[in-house]
Structures are given as C-alpha cells and as structure tokens.
Amino acid sequence: MSGLGDSSSDPANPDSHKRKGSPCDTLASSTEKRRREQENKYLEELAELLSANISDIDSLSVKPDKCKILKKTVDQIQLMKRMEQEKSTTDDDVQKSDISSSSQGVIEKESLGPLLLEALDGFFFVVNCEGRIVFVSENVTSYLGYNQEELMNTSVYSILHVGDHAEFVKNLLPKSLVNGVPWPQEATRRNSHTFNCRMLIHPPDEPGTENQEACQRYEVMQCFTVSQPKSIQEDGEDFQSCLICIARRLPRPPAITGVESFMTKQDTTGKIISIDTSSLRAAGRTGWEDLVRKCIYAFFQPQGREPSYARQLFQEVMTRGTASSPSYRFILNDGTMLSAHTKCKLCYPQSPDMQPFIMGIHIIDREHSGLSPQDDTNSGMSIPRVNPSVNPSISPAHGVARSSTLPPSNSNMVSTRINRQQSSDLHSSSHSNSSNSQGSFGCSPGSQIVANVALNQGQASSQSSNPSLNLNNSPMEGTGISLAQFMSPRRQVTSGLATRPRMPNNSFPPNISTLSSPVGMTSSACNNNNRSYSNIPVTSLQGMNEGPNNSVGFSASSPVLRQMSSQNSPSRLNIQPAKAESKDNKEIASILNEMIQSDNSSSDGKPLDSGLLHNNDRLSDGDSKYSQTSHKLVQLLTTTAEQQLRHADIDTSCKDVLSCTGTSNSASANSSGGSCPSSHSSLTERHKILHRLLQEGSPSDITTLSVEPDKKDSASTSVSVTGQVQGNSSIKLELDASKKKESKDHQLLRYLLDKDEKDLRSTPNLSLDDVKVKVEKKEQMDPCNTNPTPMTKPTPEEIKLEAQSQFTADLDQFDQLLPTLEKAAQLPGLCETDRMDGAVTSVTIKSEILPASLQSATARPTSRLNRLPELELEAIDNQFGQPGTGDQIPWTNNTVTAINQSKSEDQCISSQLDELLCPPTTVEGRNDEKALLEQLVSFLSGKDETELAELDRALGIDKLVQGGGLDVLSERFPPQQATPPLIMEERPNLYSQPYSSPSPTANLPSPFQGMVRQKPSLGTMPVQVTPPRGAFSPGMGMQPRQTLNRPPAAPNQLRLQLQQRLQGQQQLIHQNRQAILNQFAATAPVGINMRSGMQQQITPQPPLNAQMLAQRQRELYSQQHRQRQLIQQQRAMLMRQQSFGNNLPPSSGLPVQMGNPRLPQGAPQQFPYPPNYGTNPGTPPASTSPFSQLAANPEASLANRNSMVSRGMTGNIGGQFGTGINPQMQQNVFQYPGAGMVPQGEANFAPSLSPGSSMVPMPIPPPQSSLLQQTPPASGYQSPDMKAWQQGAIGNNNVFSQAVQNQPTPAQPGVYNNMSITVSMAGGNTNVQNMNPMMAQMQMSSLQMPGMNTVCPEQINDPALRHTGLYCNQLSSTDLLKTEADGTQQVQQVQVFADVQCTVNLVGGDPYLNQPGPLGTQKPTSGPQTPQAQQKSLLQQLLTE
C-alpha cells in the first residue's frame, strides 16, 4: 500500500510529478489499479471462504467491506489456531464438529473411492487406449471373481464377450485407433457413455485367460465410461488418453410376474366351446382350476341390473369384432380376491366350413383391482384379426388359425405383445408355446407368434383334436354358460401350448392362415421343421413321450405340468388325418399338434371323449389332482414305453424333443412322431412310476391311459411297436374300440366265459374291436436279465389281442400285473422265460384253444409253447373241459398256463404284456424262447438268496411286494410236515406220501408229507371212477386212480401254469363240458404229447378284449376282496377249529364247512359229473389234477401234484366245500383229489379229471366270498371234483399251472369269481414254493372250475382260513401256518384273469414245484426251488409264475 502512495501521493515531490509528466502518472495509476483489483480479488476469495462458514453467512450476505472481510479472516485464522491447540491438548471429539467446513473433507481420499464404488454397486477400472486395464478396483473379485492382480495390465478384451468387443472399442476409442494414435485435438472434451456388456466370470478351474470358451459364463454388466482424452499425470506416471469405467451388475429387471391369463373360445352364440388354461398351468400356480371357474363365473354373472360382461362383450364383439371388459372381481376358495378383465375378438377361420368363433383372453390381475382392460391385454388379445368376411364359416380351430392369416409378422407382433404382457401371455403362452406368458418358459418372442396362433390353436385344437367333438356341445350356451363347462380346465395342461415356448418365430409359417386345419395353424406356428418345439400339443407329445421328455421345450414347467399335459390321454390324440388337411408336413405337424392340444386341453385332466374342456365335467380340485397324478403316472408309464417303441419305430426323425413333433406322419406323426426319445425312461424309473401308479392310480386310469395310446396308435398310423413297450403301446386300438369296448367287453367276457371252447375256437377272433398288437416278439432275454433287458431279438409276430381297454378289475392285481407287465413288456423275454421254464417248454399250445383272455395272458407263453411244438402234451387233460373240451384244450395250454402261472405270467396276463408276449410264430423263435427260458431258470436257480434278492431289488420286485402289489408266492408253506391226513371218512387210503418233488417217481414222495394220499375211495361220497383215460376220454367219469406211481415228472411251474391257464380257459370255455380225462403221457412230462385235438385247441384264440379282461379283473378284485374277508373269517374260524379241524376228516364238516357257507353251493358243477362223481368214496375220480395231464406219468405227476393238491387244494377244497359239500363230498374231494392225484397213477390220470378234479372247470357259481365263495357244486361231485382237481392241479405243477395258466379266459364271471382261489398247497416240501408260483398261475382266474375256486379258500395261507374239513384237514395247520409264514412270499395272488385271482398257497407244494423232473419241461429252476425256494428271489418266483 505504501508503494502505491509513494510515488503518487508524496506531497513533497510535486515537482517530480510534473517532471515525469503524464506518462509516469499513467503508469503509476495503472499499476495501482491492478493492485487494487488484485486486492479485491483476494478479498472476494476470502469472503467466499468465510461465507462457507455458516456463522459468516449473515455477515457476508451483503457485499462486505474490505475491513470486515479482513477482520473476519483474522478471526477465522485465530479460531483455527485456537482449535488446533485445543485439539492437540484435549482431543475432544465434540470439538471435531466445530471444525470449519473449509478444512479438508472429513472423508479421506483413500476411503472415499471404496465408498463411492460401494455406493455404485460396481467396480472401477481404467482402460488405456490400447485396451489394457491399467487399473481395476479390488472389489472386482466380488463381481467377476478375478483378483485385482489378475486383471491389471491384461487386455480388457480377455474378460469381454466377443460380441461386445466392438461396442467397447467404440466407447473406448471413439476417435482414436487402438494403436495409441494421439487423440484428435477436437476430442479434448470428456465423453461419457453407458452401455451393457458381458463380462467373463472367472472360471472356477483356471484364472481368467483370453480363451475361456470352455467355461464361458458371462455376467451382463452395465458400464459407465468416461473418456479422458488428455493425458493425466499422477505419481509421476503419464496416463495417456484412457477410458475410465465403472461396471455394475445390470439391475435385474423386476421379476415379471407372468400375467395370469387363460383363454376361452366361444361359438357365435356365446357358448364356451373350449377353455385353454395352458398359460395358467404353465405358470405353475396351484388353484388355477378354481381361478378359472371363479373367473368365468364372475365373467358370466350379471352386473347388478346390467347384463354380464360376457353378454356385453359378446354383443360388442359380434358388432365390432373386438371388445374388452372392465375389471371385475372374484374371490377364490381360499379367500383371495382377484380382479380380471377380458378381451374378446371375433375370429374367422380360414376354412369356409368352420364357423367364426370368439376368442376371449381373461387376464387375471392379482395386484391391482385389474389391469385396465386396455393394457397389454390388448396386444394379447390382438390376435391378428381376420376380416370377419374371411371364411366366417371357418371352424373355430381354423379360427385359431385365422389369426395366422395375419401376416406372420403381425401374429408375431401380437403374440409377442401378448407374451410380453402377461395377460396376452395367456394367449401367447397358450398359443405361442406360452413362451412368454410362461415367462420363464423361454419362448422367444418369435414363438409368441405361435402364441397368437396358439390362441387360435387353443380353439383350433379343441376343434381339431376331434372334429367330432362338438365344441358347441358345451352346455354353456350364451352367457348362460354354466361354470361347469369351463370348470374342467382339465389338465389341458398346455394343451401343448405352454409347452411349446421354444418355437422359433420363424417356425410359424409366414402365412399361418394358410394352415387349413385348425390344428395346422398351431402346428404351423410350432412348425416342426423348426425343430423348435412343435406346437404339437405338448401334452400329446408328452403323453406320448411322457418319459423324460417334458414334451415341452419349457422345462420350466414342473414335471407335473408336463405330466398334466401328457395327461391328456394319448388316446385323445386320435388325430384324424382327415381333419388335418396338412398342406405340408409342417402344417400336418402343426395340425397334429393343435389337435393334440385340443384333445389335451379339452380332456387334459380326464380323457374326455369330447375332449373339450367345456364339458360340464368339472374336475373337482381333488379329482383333478388325483387324475393328474394318476393320469400322469399312467400316461408316463404308457407313453414312455409307448413313446420309446414308437420312437424307435418312427425312427423318431425328430431327435429333438422340440422337433419331436415334426417328421411324424400327419396324424400319426403327432402320436408317434410326437413321442420323443426322451420319453424313454429307465426301467427303474418306470418301476418307480408303476409303484406310484399302483399306489395312486386306479385300474381304470391305467386302462384308459393304456387304451388311449393304443387308440392314438390306431388312429394315427398303426405303429408296429418294436417291443417292450407296454402292451398298450403295442396295441393298435381302432378308434371306435373305446366306444364298443365297454359293452363289448362285457359281452365278450360273458361270451367267452359261457362259450364252449369249440365255439371259441370257431370264433377265435372276438369282435372286440380287436386291438391288433403288432408285437415284435422279443426273444427271451437271458433268464438272468434282471434289468429290464431291452427286448431280445423281437421275432415280429403279430397277434391280435383284444384291446384290453380297461382293466378296472382287481386294481391290486392289476397293479401287481402292471409293474410286472411293465417289466414283462420291457423284458418280455424275461417274463416269457420265466413262464417257459416252469412249463412244458416244448408244449405246443394253440392259442385258439385258450379263451381270448387266456390267450392274451398266455399269448406269449403259448407262443412259446407253440414254438416248442416238440413238446406235445398228449397227456393234456381237459381237466376243466367237458369231454369235448378236454380235447380242445391240450395241456399245452395248461402248460402255457403253468408258464403264465409264474408271477411274470400272471402279471403278463395284463393285456399289455400279453400283447407284448405274442408267441413266436417260428420254431426257431420257440426254441429260442425255450432256451432263454431255460437259461433264465438255470441262471436264477444258480443264484443264491442274496443274489436273487439283489435281482429282485434291481427289478423293483421287492418294492412291489412290499407295496402289496404282489404277494410273492414264496413257498408259503414250508415243506409241510405230514399233516395229519385229512381223513376223508371213507378214505381209508389217504396218501400219506407227501408230494414227491417233481421227481418223476410214480410214487409221489411226500414232499407233502403231511398230505396223505387218499385212496380213490372218497369218504362217504362215492366218486365215479373213470378209467384212466389214455386220451381225453370224453367221459369225465373219474375212476379213482390207483395210486399209480407215475414218475412225477417234475411239473414245470410254467407247465402247471400253462395247464392251469389252459384249464381255466377250458373251464371257461367248457365249463359245462365234463372234464375229459386225458391220460397224461405216462412218462416224461415234457414228453407229454398234446393230442392233435388238443393242439388244435391250442390254436390261438382271440385274446379277450381288454375290457373283458378289465371286467374280469374287476370281478376278480371284488372276489378277491370277498375272498380276503372270507379267508380272514375262515382263518379265524379255522384257527379256532384248526386244533381239531386239521385232524378231522374232510367229511367231518370241519371249518371246511365254513368255507362252504361262504361258497355258494347252489350251482351244481357245470361238469356233467354227478354230484357224487368225484365224491364216490370208493373211486376217487381219476386224478383230476391238471398236472396229471401234463405229467407223462399221470400218477407220478399226479402223485406230486395230487399230494400237493390233495393236501393243499383238497384240504382247502374240503374246507371250502366241506360245509356246502357233504362231509362225504369233502372227503371225496380229498380222497378224490388225493386219489385222483395219487390213485390215478394212470397216465390218463390227468385227463380223467373227475368232477372232483380241481382242474376240472367247475361251473360252480362264483362263491360269494371270492375265495370261499366258490360254491361247491350241489353235487358232491363238484366239490370233490374241484378238490380233486385242485389237488391235482396243485399236485401237478402242470395241473396247477394249468389252472393258473388257464388264463382267465373269460369264463363265467361266477366261475372266475369262484376261480379266485387261494390255493394253499399243503405239502411237506418247501418245494411248494415252486408250486406256489404255479399255484399263483393256478389262480384259476381262467379256470372255470368253481371247485378250483373253492380250493382257493383252502389255499388261504392261514390254515385257519382254509377249510380244514377237507384238504385243510389234510394239511396240518402247522403246515399251513408254516406255509403261510414261509409263503408270505409264497402266496401270491396272481390275477390270472382280471376276474379271477388265485392266491395259491402251495403247502408242501415245493416237492411238486421242485420236482426235479419238470413236467417234462419244468426247468430245474422249479426243481431247485426248495424250502429255500421260499427264500428264492421274488424275481425267480415271478419268473416261475
């Protein structure tokens, strides 16, 4: 300041001023001015600094004077100094708050960066112009997994997705080259950009490198970049122009809650003709059915005085073409209040023959009272409108297609829009694979086009699936539609729509409208060609594939959804090729898809013939759930196998699940083509499914499902099923089969039951809407195939099996059969071998002889037998048949029965198995089968318990048994100790010898030691003794057989099963026919030659219709139930009576009587035999044992069988008949069976089936108690016959197997009911086990003989349950109990027929089963089975059965 004044203001130097003149003055003034300005500037800065202090703001609010500013500055400086001093001295925290804001920030630079990065939720990195990362923040690890050091000085491109390199370069060096050329001068300003890029996540195995293609996992990052054009000098480093980036995870879009929506299609009267709930299903929410019901109800409810929205929209849409409703509310059952709005559009199908229809999209809004109807729903609803003028007549399905008429782009737009909008999603999801609406389903917008189409498709599908379906049928008419119609949204699950999310947009042909068929539209949308998932209703595909393949590209949907979609029963997919006028394969595929969808959607949950959801059927939630699960399971099972077969057959040109639909031929394409390889599920999976199915499902479900696929097959091209698939997959059901099946099955069943064998023979093919099953016969797999072995070489053999449409019969049995069937189907060879080994391998059986049902059941074994012509069963007796029938029914059939008897067989009995089990037509095939069977038997025989158990576990048999699906016929009866011979009073000669093991020795060693062979004289009841018949003597007169020591050929269980089955068939066919006594070939059971007549009889008869079988099964089930009750009652009574009852002679009217009361005695035996026939004490009927027939040496074979039978069966019979039958009868029965079995040593023994012969089919009406009910024929004969026969059957493995083997040919239901026999073979031997499988076969489902049935009660495991009076008496209660204990597995209720279930408890049957000498063909396996047979694996038992 002094300087300023020095020169200018110095008064002492005025002269000097003047001397200097103006130039000096000017200079001085300019300098002072500058200084003044500078001073002012500093003061201003001070003021600013001070003003930063809140305390100074007031003072600085007005422009301060210099003095004040300076003063304040001084004060501030002093304050700062004072504070610093205080801080250093006191370091008081409170003082910190007083620190001036002008001081350094509270946040240090070091901590500020991390805080900012944390706030940004990203990491910071700097990239130089060369693309190298010169700096990266440490928190990059939490984002990309790389360490800071790993990325420093590395190329940024190493962590960028290749597709994002260009974008990054553009942002990094917008105006420079990567080589570091200096930034242009104009680029001096900083440029900021925000873009998204994919950054590589650090692979777990190795540090980030430039090539991480193997484990390329990228995270989408949002990068905010600032270019720093000027070089930056920091810490001595000169950073050239660089890009400063902050990368943060792309904010995850709020989870788009898929708009819940469903679509309805209404006809031009306002009636709902279909409902597409695929979108809701795909969403996976529970309660969607209720939602649909309530929403539709609210939509159709009048709004106060106003008409319902449905009516309003209907009127508007009919006039304007489109309409949308305001939001309306409804409350779900759980109290949730939802709002919804509906958009409707009038659609004109392309096809002029189709009527216009109204597509409505109902969008549910859970969050708001409702979307504005105009919201997305518009897009969703904006199905490309076809001008109303366009083919107004187009069918609704086409209507669906109509949207396709829009340029594909439009439809895509619409669909896409819809997809985007969750509500539209409904459409898109349903139509466009519900890809978007599925939301997560992953449909690309392109697929949404499909959605559009799909929307139409939903309509189309409903229509297309069954042109016949009257969409209009829906009861809902006009707005008055009742909820019920929409009620059953049926598991339309995705009618394939939801599942199709994957369709590429292009899959939709540009011009969807071109699709002529309603389905076509959808399908075009799903164009198979695109391999994207074709629109074929996923459900149908799934149903077909049902296996692993979720039919849909959208795996998102739960398996349940998938199953649900598959639930639409495949049969529903009867695609009518005509319906699908496919312009090209794509169209066809789309049409098929659509049809399937429509079917699926309409009958999703339940197969609806109409296939339309509109059906009033409401699925109650429970029902729907149940049906979903069971249907899903059943379908899963059926479709998996079916699919696999189909897939193989079709060659599944579409390897892609998605493309699965493609390639298949039009209609059939969807059914067969639809199935994808993915459907192949492992056997284990299938077993699991079966177990679940058995637990949850009902036979009807299974039947329906099984039939439906069959129908699909037939409707579509008949697909020759390669193999193991379940019978249904194999079965081609004619489309009309379902219509006729119910009544026809019953008629056929009755027909078969009542029809003589001859008649049957004459009409081998029943008009059961025969299901032609092309089963490529698989050669038997090695016996050891525990795994469902792939079918062995299939010897293609076509068998027409009556479609067993429904096996509603015994669910338990059916369930038991199912898993086995499943296995059998899968391992037909296995099953076959099992059956084969036990039975006469060489026995040639003409399936004709067998009733259709038997045929189906024994088809395979029979075929095997047929294959084994060398084994002729000369000795085959018609144990059941009347004289004529005996000839017709060779024991071969019995043998087949025996074979079938094995559990496998029984299980195989299910038509599916039967279909699969068509006998090989060629000798080679038969031989192969025989060889395989033998191998299997030998293999199993060689296994120890643990190995067998492992096999069982591997096959899931143990689970089946545990689940109660199968009662394993383990040797239920430990080798029975010699039971006190049931003393038929008259029978002085009880054969005390237990059944000998199958040893051919004439004398039946007493494997049933407890069983005394009864002499021919049967107690009080005289038994007509028919001379041993060398051949089937027409006269059934049964001579008491002398105890001929027929070498008991080891009866093959299979043979026994076959025999039983044959017998059952014969009985069924010839219930009225007297059992003709056939001599068994005296010697080698295997050597048994069938009479030519027998062989002819063997000619395959048309298998029973599936429905017939189902009916039988139902009857059988009821019978079983009654039997179980009776057995329990009897058991209790017998237990009480047992103490004395066992010892009582059969005639003593011991608890046996109990059995009798249960058994209706009223019906005299169908056999002409006089009541006394078998009962004549003096002459036990010739051995009635069916086994004897098989046995070359009737006596030997009988001896074994008879003793078994006598003990187990006769005792049982006695018990059963005892009351109903005179004590004489009972005695006779015992005697007779004993005598017949033992006494009739004659080779003829088997043929001479005394009425008492258990093998002889007794026409006895089914006992009211299924087991005990078998009414003993009024005539004493009948019961004895039954008893004897059973004894014989038991005694003879063949016989028994015959009884069992006689497949439940439709016999009189009563017979079957009666036939349901639990045969307890009391024998000393544990061999009974083997017997048991035989006995299981023996389950006389097929057997006509009530006596057999009567025996069944006897067979009851619990001796108490068994009638002790006769056979039971013979069998010591101890034996029975033992057998029961041993035979927990032994007793296996096998459903030979649906109608008949025999629980055969072989008591001491082991000898017979184990008889080393198979009845000729009996495999060593049966022989090997000894008491340890009880321990034998379930598998082995199943096989033996």
From Swiss-Prot:
A motif (LXXLL motif 3) lies at residues 633-637. The modification Phosphothreonine is found at T1179. Sumoylated; sumoylation increases its interaction with PGR and prolongs its retention in the nucleus. It does not prevent its ubiquitination and does not exert a clear effect on the stability of the protein. Residues 23-80 form the bHLH domain. Changing K732R: Abolishes sumoylation. Residues 83-96, 615-624 have a biased composition (Basic and acidic residues). There is a cross-link at K846 (Glycyl lysine isopeptide (Lys-Gly) (interchain with G-Cter in SUMO2)). Residues 1-39, 83-105, 368-443, 457-477, 561-585, 597-626, 662-723, 1143-1188, 1409-1441 are annotated as: Disordered. GO terms for molecular function: chromatin binding; histone acetyltransferase activity; nuclear estrogen receptor binding; nuclear receptor binding; nuclear retinoid X receptor binding; protein dimerization activity; protein-containing complex binding; RNA polymerase II transcription regulatory region sequence-specific DNA binding. The record marks R867, L868 as: Breakpoint for translocation to form PAX3-NCOA1 oncogene. It catalyses: L-lysyl-[protein] + acetyl-CoA = N(6)-acetyl-L-lysyl-[protein] + CoA + H(+). Changing K846R: Does not affect sumoylation of the protein. Nuclear receptor coactivator that directly binds nuclear receptors and stimulates the transcriptional activities in a hormone-dependent fashion. Involved in the coactivation of different nuclear receptors, such as for steroids (PGR, GR and ER), retinoids (RXRs), thyroid hormone (TRs) and prostanoids (PPARs). Also involved in coactivation mediated by STAT3, STAT5A, STAT5B and STAT6 transcription factors. Displays histone acetyltransferase activity toward H3 and H4; the relevance of such activity remains however unclear. This is Nuclear receptor coactivator 1. The lineage of its organism: Eukaryota, Metazoa, Chordata, Craniata, Vertebrata. The gene is NCOA1.
